[in-house]
């Protein structure tokens, strides 16, 4: 067998191992949603558009990350 073929096969083997490892280590797991629903919140027209959370688990305790206008904030959950 020619040396360049062996080199090519070895390179493909290494590359396939690296790709398989990259796929398994980079899987994202989204956090679970906390129980309850976001409360209905009335907001004033000049309410600031600040992002205080993205997921429920960004909030302390049992609070949920709820949309408030163009923002998201942590609130105690409402009833199911």
UniProtKB/Swiss-Prot annotation:
InterPro entries the UniProt entry points to: Elafin-like_sf, WAP_dom, WAP_four-disulfide_core
SMART domains for the chain: WAP
An example Gene Ontology biological process: defense response to bacterium
Principal subcellular localization: secreted
Protein name per the record: Waprin-Phi3
Keyword Lipid metabolism: no
Top-rank taxon, per record: Eukaryota
Keyword Secreted on entry: yes
Keywords: Antibiotic, Antimicrobial, Disulfide bond, Secreted, Signal
Disulfide linkage: 38-66, 49-70, 53-65, 59-74
Tissue specificity statement from the Swiss-Prot or TrEMBL entry: Expressed by the venom gland.
Organism encoding this protein: Philodryas olfersii
Domain WAP: from-to ranges: 31-78
GO cellular component: extracellular region; extracellular space
Function: Damages membranes of susceptible bacteria. Has no hemolytic activity. Not toxic to mice. Does not inhibit the proteinases elastase and cathepsin G.
Subcellular location: Secreted
Region forming the signal peptide: 1-22
């Amino acid at each position: 067998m020619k040396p360049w073929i062996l080199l090519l096969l070895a390179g493909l083997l290494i590359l396939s191992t690296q790709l398989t490892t990259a796929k398994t280590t980079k899987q994202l797991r989204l956090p679970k949603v906390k129980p309850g629903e976001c409360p209905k919140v009335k907001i004033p027209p000049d309410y600031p558009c600040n992002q205080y959370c993205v997921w429920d688990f960004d909030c302390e305790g049992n609070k949920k990350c709820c949309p408030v206008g163009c923002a998201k904030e942590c609130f105690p959950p409402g009833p199911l």
